[in-house]
Amino acid sequence: MTTPSSFNPQAFIELALSRGVLKFGEFTLKSGRVSPYFFNAGLLNDGEALSLLAQGYADQLMQCQHVDVIFGPAYKGIPFVAATAVALSQLHAKSVPWGFNRKEAKDHGEGGVLVGASVEGKKVWIIDDVITAGTAIREVVTILKNAGATIAGVLVALDRQERGQGQLSAIQEVQQELEIPVHALITMKDLMNYLDAKGETQALAKMEDYRLKYGI
């Protein structure tokens, strides 16, 4: 039996705020930029939060074609992909095989780097939290292609919509270089719309300044 499912970005933002996943303020990023917000998906560490995130991923996947296997990069992507497989089954009556990778290859038992469903000859969607520099995604894409997979696309929780070292964002660079789609559940624009709706003018002004300086 399936239940109606419709991901609500505002509800997800509110949950992220309540869990400390999303914070507004001043945060120095690895790039040296001082960001007016910070997003840490590792704090989506309870059943309700993980369930809402997985619902979002599942809803997105139902709009995508060619979903043979879903894949979660180690380590953070592993619970995300497992929960998404459950959400697809429970909310959409769609049973999708899933897998993940190890950080280090195993030389005993089943061995290798990949765990779970076979990706050989399959169209695979990668599920992760964010794409910051794109390094991790590129590594996973290489692993999957070496195993015979075709990369159908990538799903992330947040698109920061800001430039990297050049004029493109990390997501745009990945899309251009790897020629695959990347979809996000929420974007920086969604965060700004949320602040605007809540009348948080000071935080919104800081977001707008940051967007003008670094946005795409």
From Swiss-Prot:
Its cofactor is Mg(2+). Keywords: Glycosyltransferase, Magnesium, Pyrimidine biosynthesis, Transferase. It is an enzyme of class 2 (transferase). Orotate binds at residues 38-39, 132, 160. Its EC number is 2.4.2.10. GO terms for molecular function: magnesium ion binding; orotate phosphoribosyltransferase activity. Catalyzes the transfer of a ribosyl phosphate group from 5-phosphoribose 1-diphosphate to orotate, leading to the formation of orotidine monophosphate (OMP). This is Orotate phosphoribosyltransferase. It comes from Acinetobacter baylyi (strain ATCC 33305 / BD413 / ADP1). The lineage of its organism: Bacteria, Pseudomonadati, Pseudomonadota, Gammaproteobacteria, Moraxellales.
